[in-house]
A protein has these predicted regions:
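Active-site helix of classical SDR
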Residues: 152, 189
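The beta1-alpha1 cofactor-binding region of Rossmann-like NAD(H)/NADP(H)-dependent oxidoreductases
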Residues: 69-70, 89-101, 134
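Active-site-adjacent segment of SDR/Rossmann-fold oxidoreductases
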Residues: 58, 178, 199-209
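Residue(s) in the substrate-gating loop at a strand-loop-helix junction
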Residues: 173
Length: 320
């Protein structure tokens, strides 16, 4: 071997370059994603489009599904111009039958589905507990929660059928880990998405389907304008109060000051390579989470001191 390079060292160097070379600042195994297909709801803009671009850069086929046809067409052309194999399909995530159609079209175009990114979501109504109305709650539940349920229900069998494994990526929020006052519906649905994701990890492990949940804080998207896609059946006859409008305006300003959406897609790819379950985009929120976990730990400690629970302290935990 020239320059004193041993055969073993050369092999190790080759493996290192294959599995850890730099691509857009991230470590990438090209074979992990290349030629496979991802279905992304809410893929026409914002976080969904950012993820579509990042996966496209890894040579994946992408199916972008969105309720906004105009944005969908624009996003499709943008991805095509970047050399990404793309299929654009209109989708209302709250309708299971439309998810079925997306799955059918994805399989017809690309043959197999390997990943679903349940990204589509709405900000929901803002306001006090007593001011929230049923239609507003139903809108947020149907899109943010049932949209994820339907996406996984339809796409999981398609991922299982080829036996190659795959991914489910659910987009939640830091709000799901620590509640936002006056945004009860949004907070509740994002907490539910995190819990669902935690449930699915153990269920799908045997099928080599990796589950992740993305929990961003404020990102520069148009989630504050999600009202534009609110169908008639979810619209309320009750006018928004001035204080509710003020809360919505404040939230909008926070979103506009958020991080660049392009970072999020790249971060998702980085996290999937490392098989991360919780995917965070705002490490500066760690201290807030530590406050919560400390409070939980303290509550457990107090329960251990309760005379009512003394016989339970040493009981073994039985899992199903």
């Amino acid at each position: 071997m020239p320059f004193g390079i041993t055969k073993k060292w050369k092999i190790n160097l080759t493996l290192f370059l294959q599995h850890n070379h730099l691509f857009n600042g991230s470590r990438v195994r090209m074979s992990q994603f290349a030629g496979k297909t991802a279905v992304i709801s809410g893929g026409a803009e914002g976080i969904g489009l950012s993820i579509a671009k990042a996966l496209g850069n890894q040579k994946m086929n992408v199916v972008i599904a969105d309720i906004d046809e105009k944005s969908l067409t624009k996003a499709s052309l943008e991805l095509e111009s970047e050399g990404v194999p793309v299929l654009a399909v209109k989708l209302d995530v709250a309708k299971e039958e439309q998810w079925q159609e997306v799955g059918n079209q994805a399989a017809a175009r690309f043959g197999k589905v390997h990943m679903v990114v349940n990204n589509a979501g709405v900000g929901g109504d803002t306001g006090s507990i007593e001011s929230q109305n049923k239609k507003g709650w139903q809108w947020t539940l149907d899109v943010n929660l049932m949209g994820v349920v339907y996406g996984a229900k339809v796409m999981t069998p398609l991922i299982k059928e080829h036996g190659e494994g795959g991914w489910i990526v659910n987009v939640a929020s830091m709000a799901g880990l620590g509640g936002i006052p006056y945004a009860g519906a949004y907070t509740a649905t994002k907490a539910a998405v995190i819990a669902l994701s935690e449930s699915w990890v153990g269920e799908l492990e045997k099928d080599s389907i990796h589950v992740s949940v993305l929990c961003p804080a404020f990102v520069k998207t148009r989630i504050y304008a999600s009202e534009r896609n609110r169908s008639e059946k979810y619209k309320s006859d009750v006018a928004r109060k001035p204080e509710e409008a003020a809360l919505a305006s404040s939230a909008e300003q926070m979103v506009k000051k958020g991080i660049d959406v392009a970072i999020v897609g790249k971060r998702v790819v980085e996290a999937l390579i490392d098989k991360e379950f919780y995917i965070f985009t705002h490490p500066n929120y760690r201290s807030l989470m530590q406050e919560k976990t400390s409070a939980i730990d303290e509550a457990f400690a107090k329960s251990e001191q309760s005379p009512l629970l003394k016989n339970i302290v040493s009981q073994e935990i039985e899992m199903p």
